[in-house]
From Swiss-Prot:
Name of the protein this chain belongs to: Peptidyl-tRNA hydrolase
Naturally occurring in which organism (per UniProt): Mycobacterium avium (strain 104)
Subcellular location: Cytoplasm
Molecular function per GO: peptidyl-tRNA hydrolase activity; tRNA binding
Annotated InterPro entries: Pept_tRNA_hydro, Pept_tRNA_hydro_CS, Pept_tRNA_hydro_sf
Gene Ontology CC terms: cytoplasm
Subunit structure: Monomer.
Length: 191
């Protein structure tokens, strides 16, 4: 039997961060778990919360690291090892300052764009060659510090669109699982 794909939503644990821009990865992971009809449970060896089952016809483990974003690799690395998942079979869902709010893009590899959660995952895996579902949160206004911006809640105007954006990101993740990168990019990047 083929090893599962590992889908990781990045975010920060705790109610204080639940509605922040940095937590869209967690929001999408929650939607994927609901689509699988499962609830997250603790994975003792890694410390992350996981759901395992089928998604888009494949065996999948969806994970939410329960450490802070900048330390995500500390739990993603052990999960990948436990399930024998190579970097190319890992999908990381994360916020992206370099994309306009609501834009979704798929890619594999590349730089981290200053995203310390991605950097932590890359370091833990010893590779940047994992798949990514990038969810645009836009740039901070004026001279606002990007580190502070990502930890703020969405504005009331943005908040109205977040559920739809997260549903689209979950759809994009399922297309990536079902079709592979290039065919999924062709569809998602046309949205």
């Amino acid at each position: 039997m083929a090893e599962p794909l590992l889908v990781v939503g990045l975010g920060n644990p705790g109610d204080n961060y639940a509605r922040t821009r940095h937590n869209v990865g967690f929001m999408v992971a929650d939607l994927l778990a609901a689509r699988m009809g499962s609830k997250f449970k603790a994975h003792k060896r890694s410390g992350a919360e996981i759901v395992s089952g089928r998604l888009a016809g494949r065996s999948v483990v969806v994970a939410k690291p329960r450490c802070y974003m900048n330390e995500s690799g500390r739990q993603v690395g052990p999960l990948a090892k436990f399930y024998s998942v190579p970097p190319g079979d890992i999908i990381v869902i994360h916020d992206d300052l370099d994309l306009d709010f609501g834009r979704i893009r798929l890619k594999i590899g590349g730089g981290e764009g200053g995203h310390n959660g991605l950097r932590s995952v890359s370091n833990a895996l010893g590779s940047k060659d994992f798949q990514r579902v990038r969810i645009g949160i836009g740039r901070p206004p004026g001279r606002k510090d990007p580190a502070a911006f990502v930890l703020e809640n969405f504005t009331s105007t943005e908040r109205a669109d977040v559920p739809t954006i997260c549903e689209q990101a979950a759809d994009a993740t399922e297309l990536l699982i079902e079709l592979g990168l290039e065919p999924a990019q062709n569809r998602v990047h046309a949205w």
